[in-house]
Amino acid sequence: MRERLVVIDDQISPALVQELCGKKIETWRIEDGACVPDRSPIHTRSHGTVCAALAGEFLPELELVGISTGGNGGAQVENVCAALEWCFQDGAAVVCMSMGVTCGLDLARMGTAARALRQAGCWVFCASSNGGKLTFPAAYPWTVGVKFDPTAREVQQVDPRWGCDVAVGLFQSQVLDKLAEEEPFFHARTNSLAVAMAASQVLQAGGVDHLPVKSQKLWVPDGNKAFQSWEKPVVRLLHSRGKWEALLEEFSRQSYWPVLLSDQVETDWSKMAARVRCLEEAAALLPQLAETAILFLEVPEGNPTVWDYQLDLSQMEAKEACRKVLGFFGEEE
């Protein structure tokens, strides 16, 4: 493991990073799916430049490396995956990235790369969506998902069912103070700007589990009402044990993003599943699941008006169950 901190972001200007935080940065970029030295870096105060400067400020003891992945769109996901794979080959100790995707389909390569990095001993810190949606790779169990929360005290661990692992409270930054002299926006704090701060505190504490816990109740007062206003299909499952993973895989294969909320599973967003004990807990997670295609629900009690369809998995295999659900909602395989 090399004592290197890699920042993965859109565009990174080495000259401006050094100007902001006083550290030199080695810069690379993704070109045609490969990570190559950045011979002609841009000179702009981009999102990536700011995040890299913050990494240099909060983790000054590590050698600083930046990978520019380019613009947005579908190719961006592949570029992020290529950058993560390069970090694994490089033997990086820490990765910080303030970017991600809010759709859980076609992410096998990203998940594999994130898991490999963690198994190699690398810490991967990722920003959650500022809009509160479930975000990858931040939600994966192999990364440390970060959000800014002004009610948090410094850096605290949070319930991973929220799709992240730590909440960062208000914090001071010389880099942001310098930027705020010209752009008042930088007086504010966002999930992206909090990543490096979170990384420094988690590493100093020796891991997320050593941080104080922030209490954030997973509960809404009226679960029935919340579900009745939910616009996506809801299917109640019965007897899902041992079968739900195959069911979700089948829907993913059909290009529908499925999520399971159940009292029969442990939370693992890499499998698109979270443990909830009741309808009120499930309802609390609905806002972050806004981009899912279909929600499977398995809780002990509930009003039948909450779900659109009920499925007993003891009676059928995954392919038949998928066919029945799609047929009910008027979709064709």
For the regions a language model picked out, list residue spans one by one.
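Active-site core segment of subtilase-fold serine proteases
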Residues: M1-L54, F58, L62, E181
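Walker A (P-loop) phosphate-binding motif
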Residues: F227-D263
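Mature extracellular/periplasmic domains of secretome proteins
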Residues: Q76-C96, L107-A120, G132-G145, A152-V166
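Extracellular S/T/G-rich loop segment that most often corresponds to the catalytic His/Ser-adjacent loop
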Residues: D9, P14, Q18, T135-L203
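Structural detector of well-ordered beta-strand residues that form the stable sheet scaffold
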Residues: V65, W123-F125
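ATP-dependent carboxylate-amine ligase catalytic core
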Residues: E250-L326
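Subtilisin-like peptidase catalytic core
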Residues: P37-T102
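Extreme N-terminal, non-catalytic leader segments
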Residues: E183-S192, A196, S200-V234
